[in-house]
């Protein structure tokens, strides 16, 4: 299988690393990664105290919010999300 390699503007070879998972136990829901990603890959979702997903409208049930991968196919492999994550929640992989 061929390696997907890109080149930066300066000519440096670069292998994209695509988002694979987010450690939701470590995630504090700060939203930094969401702001860094302009590709609509991520979504902030709410959890209740039992760890079940709840709709944002149910504010009284929300225990905390965590980031999720909403559109993995839109990831371009830039790793901007993980570079700004204060808790190192992201796992990335190349297409190899």
UniProtKB/Swiss-Prot annotation:
Residues 18-47, 65-95 form the 4Fe-4S ferredoxin-type domain. The keyword Cell division does not apply. [4Fe-4S] cluster 1 binds at residues 27, 30, 33, 37. It holds the Pfam family Fer4_7. [4Fe-4S] cluster 2 binds at residues 75, 78, 81, 85. The keyword Lipid metabolism does not apply. InterPro entries: 4Fe4S_Fe-S-bd, 4Fe4S_Fe_S_CS, FdIII_4_nif, Fe-S_Ferredoxin. Binds 2 [4Fe-4S] clusters. GO terms for biological process: nitrogen fixation. It comes from the Bacteria. Homodimer. Ferredoxins are iron-sulfur proteins that transfer electrons in a wide variety of metabolic reactions. This is Ferredoxin-3. It comes from Leptolyngbya boryana (Plectonema boryanum). The lineage of its organism: Bacteria, Bacillati, Cyanobacteriota, Cyanophyceae, Leptolyngbyales. The gene is fdxB.
